[in-house]
Amino acid sequence: GSFRRFERIAVAFCAGSLLLIPVYFLAHPHATQMARNFVIPQLPGGSGQLATVMLLVIGIVGTTVAPWQLFFQQSYVIDKRITPRFMKYEKADLCIGIVIVVVGGAALMGATAAAFAGTHGLGHFTDAAGLASGLQAYGGRMLGVLFAIALLDASIIGAFAVSLSTAYAVSDVFGINHSLHRGVRSAKGFYAVYAALIGAAAAIVLIPGSPLGLLTEGVQVLAGVLLPSASVFLLLLCNDREVLGPWVNGRKTNTFTAAVVAVLVTLSVILTASVLFPSISSRQILEIMIVCGAAGVLAAGYTLTRRLRGGGAAAAVDRAGQETWRMPPLALLQRPAMSVGRKIGMGALRLYLGVAMILVIVKIVQLALGH
C-alpha cells in the first residue's frame, strides 16, 4: 500500500474535472441568463411537476455536499498522518476543491441547458448517455467526446472516494486494520470491502436495461435527505470539548451549520408536501418556506433567550495548544450527557429521517412507473 501513490493518482483525476470548462465554451451558453437565474431562481414545470423538481433540487444538494464526504474527509486526513499544525493547508485544499466542483457544476449545467433548449430532447433523456448524445448533436463530436471523458473521470473519482469512505467506516466500526499505507496482507478486511463495493457497482452498471439515471438520482436524493442527520451528528461532535479541546466550534460556525441544517430540512418538508399533494403550486411552496423560516427564527430566539437567562454568553473557547492537541484514547472518553431537549431533538430527527426516506422511495418508484 502507498498512500502517496493513491493521492497523486486521485489528484490527477480531479484535475480532469477541468475538462468541463472547454465543454462550457464549446456549447456557447447564455452567460447573462445563467447569472440572472443564479440570483433569481425559478421553478420550472407546472404544479403537477413540482414534486419532481424538488426531488432534483435535493439530489443536487446531495451530490454536492454528500453525507459520506463528512466521514471520508476525517478518515482520509487521519490516514494521511498529518498533525493539527497542517490544518491551514487542509482548509486551503478543501477550498480549492470546492471552487473546482462549483465551477464544473455550473459549466455542465450551462452547457446542457444551451444544448437542449428548444429541442425535442429537452426533458426526455434519462441518463448520461442521452446527455452525451444531445451535446454531440448540438456542438459536434468534440463536445460529446470531451463530456464523455469528463464523465469517465468523475466516475473513477466517485468509485475511489465513495468505496474508500465505506471501507474506512466499516473498518472503524469493526476494529479492522485500515490504511492505504498498509499492504493487502496487513489490511485484508479493509481492501476486501473496498474491492467488493467497486465490484458490486460495476455489476449493477452491467445489468441490461438497468435504469442508471433513475438510480443515480435516487441515491443522490437519499444523500440529500440524510445530510441533515449527518450534519447534526457532526455538529454535536464538533462541540464536544473532551474530543476536540481547543478545536471545538465557535458560535459563528454553529450558527452557520444550524442554518444549513434548517435549509435542508425545509427542502425535505417541501418534498414531503409535494409527494403527498402532487398538485401543490409554487405559491404554496413559498408559503411552506416562509413558515419554516419563521419557525427557525423562533427557535433561534428561544435558544438565545434561554442562554441569556442561564448566565449570559457562553464561556470563551481557549484556543491555546491547537497545534499540539491530541484526542484522548476512545476508551478514556466520558459518555456525553444528553439533556431532555437534545433527546427530543434527536427523536424528531429520527422521525424525519424515516418519513423522508419513505417518501423519497415512493417518489422514485412513481418516476420509474411513469407516474
Mark where each language-model region is.
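Hydrophobic alpha-helical segments and their helix-loop junctions in multi-pass secondary transporters
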Residues: 1, 14-45, 54-74, 233-240, ...
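C-terminal membrane-solvent junction of multi-pass transporters and transport-like membrane proteins
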Residues: 3, 9-12, 180-195, 217-272, ...
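A generic transmembrane alpha-helix motif of multi-pass inner-membrane proteins
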Residues: 50-55, 252-312, 350-357, 363
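Helix-loop junctions at the membrane interface of multi-pass solute transporters
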Residues: 61-90, 114, 172, 236-237
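Junctions where cytoplasmic loops transition into the N-terminal start of transmembrane alpha-helices
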Residues: 77, 83-106, 355
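Extracellular/periplasmic helix-exit of transmembrane alpha-helices
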Residues: 77-78, 99-130, 367
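Loop-to-transmembrane helix boundary motifs in multi-pass membrane proteins
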Residues: 96, 100, 142, 146, ...
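Membrane-helix boundary/coupling elements in multi-pass transport proteins
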Residues: 105-108, 113, 144-176
